[in-house]
Amino acid sequence: MSITKDQIIEAVAAMSVMDVVELISAMEEKFGVSAAAAVAVAAGPVEAAEEKTEFDVILKAAGANKVAVIKAVRGATGLGLKEAKDLVESAPAALKEGVSKDDAEALKKSLEEAGAEVEVK
């Protein structure tokens, strides 16, 4: 009769911490492995999160002072009055795409000062 995995798990669960430590040591000796190495291999190499370099500036809402927002959009995008007005009225809309973080933050600040609700993605 062979022992199932569930029976092994139940047996280990019933052991004290010291018994489990002794079991691990015995398994390391028997199979010539190290539990610490297995944990490191299982975790894998940790890669640093790649920092985003391009951002999109999204106008979510014009706010109460639509005229000031239209002026700010015109200044930032170089659009004509009608195009800027249409863009502001069609919010949420992308104002600029693929800009640097500094440019995106500066644009966001100027639009928020004009009263707009802006998101940088």
Swiss-Prot record:
What does the function comment of this entry state? Forms part of the ribosomal stalk which helps the ribosome interact with GTP-bound translation factors. Is thus essential for accurate translation.
Give the Gene Ontology MF terms in alphabetical order: mRNA binding; structural constituent of ribosome
Q: Name one GO biological process term.
A: translation
Q: What is the protein named?
A: Large ribosomal subunit protein bL12
Please indicate which superkingdom the organism of origin belongs to: Bacteria
Q: How does it assemble?
A: Homodimer. Part of the ribosomal stalk of the 50S ribosomal subunit. Forms a multimeric L10(L12)X complex, where L10 forms an elongated spine to which 2 to 4 L12 dimers bind in a sequential fashion. Binds GTP-bound translation factors.
Task: Please give the organism.
Answer: Shigella sonnei (strain Ss046)
Q: Which family does it belong to?
A: Belongs to the bacterial ribosomal protein bL12 family.
* Keywords, in A-Z order: Ribonucleoprotein, Ribosomal protein
Upper taxonomic lineage: Bacteria, Pseudomonadati, Pseudomonadota, Gammaproteobacteria, Enterobacterales
Q: Pull one GO CC term from this UniProt entry.
A: cytosolic large ribosomal subunit
TM ranges: none
* Gene name of the encoded protein: rplL
Q: Which Pfam families match?
A: Ribosomal_L12, Ribosomal_L12_N
